[in-house]
C-alpha cells in the first residue's frame, strides 16, 4: 500500500491544519505528503514543515484538486486529510468534492478534522 497522504484545507482552516501538522510531525515523517502549492504556501507562512517529505502539485485554482484526484484514482494515495470550513463558508479556492469522491471510490480513509486525522495516521 502506498504511504502518501493528501493534505488539504479550506483557507479559513489552514491554520488548524498547520497546527495539526506541527503536533503530529513525528508520525507524519513516515509518510510522503501531497499538498497543493497554494495550500502549502499558506501553511508555510505560519509553520515550519522541516523534516517532512512534501511533494507539491499545482495550486487548487490551477487544477490542483483535479491533479490530486487523479493521483488518488491511480491508487497512489493511502489517505485523504481535508479540513473543510466548519461554518460552510468556502474560500472559493478549495473544493472538497473533487477529492472526496475519488477517495470514496478507492475506499480510502478520509479525515475531516484534527481528531479524525490523528486517528487516520495512527492506523485506527
Regions found by a protein language model. Give the residues of each.
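Short active-site oxyanion
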Residues: 3-5, 26-33, 106-108
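Short, glycine-rich nucleotide/cofactor-binding loops
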Residues: 5-15
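General beta-strand structural signal in soluble alpha/beta enzymes
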Residues: 7, 34-36, 56-58, 82, ...
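Histidine-anchored nucleotide/phosphate-binding helix
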Residues: 14-28
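Short internal beta-strands
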Residues: 30-43
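Active-site rim loops that border cofactor/substrate pockets in soluble metabolic enzymes
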Residues: 40, 45-66
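Mid-chain, well-packed structural core segment of small domains
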Residues: 62-102
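Ser/Thr/Gly-rich flexible loops in soluble cytosolic domains mediating phosphotransfer, phosphorylation
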Residues: 96-124
Amino acid at each position: 500500500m502506498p504511504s502518501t497522504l493528501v493534505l488539504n484545507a479550506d483557507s479559513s482552516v489552514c491554520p488548524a491544519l498547520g497546527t495539526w501538522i506541527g503536533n503530529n510531525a513525528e508520525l507524519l515523517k513516515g509518510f510522503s505528503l501531497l499538498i497543493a502549492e497554494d495550500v502549502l504556501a499558506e501553511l508555510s507562512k505560519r509553520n515550519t514543515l522541516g523534516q517532512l517529505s512534501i511533494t507539491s502539485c499545482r495550486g487548487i485554482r490551477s487544477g490542483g484538486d483535479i491533479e490530486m484526484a487523479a493521483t488518488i484514482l491511480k491508487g497512489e494515495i493511502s489517505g485523504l486529510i481535508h479540513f473543510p470550513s466548519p461554518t460552510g463558508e468556502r474560500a472559493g479556492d478549495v473544493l472538497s468534492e473533487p477529492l472526496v469522491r475519488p477517495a470514496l471510490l478507492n475506499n480510502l480513509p478520509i479525515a475531516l478534522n484534527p481528531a479524525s486525522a490523528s486517528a487516520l495516521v495512527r492506523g485506527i
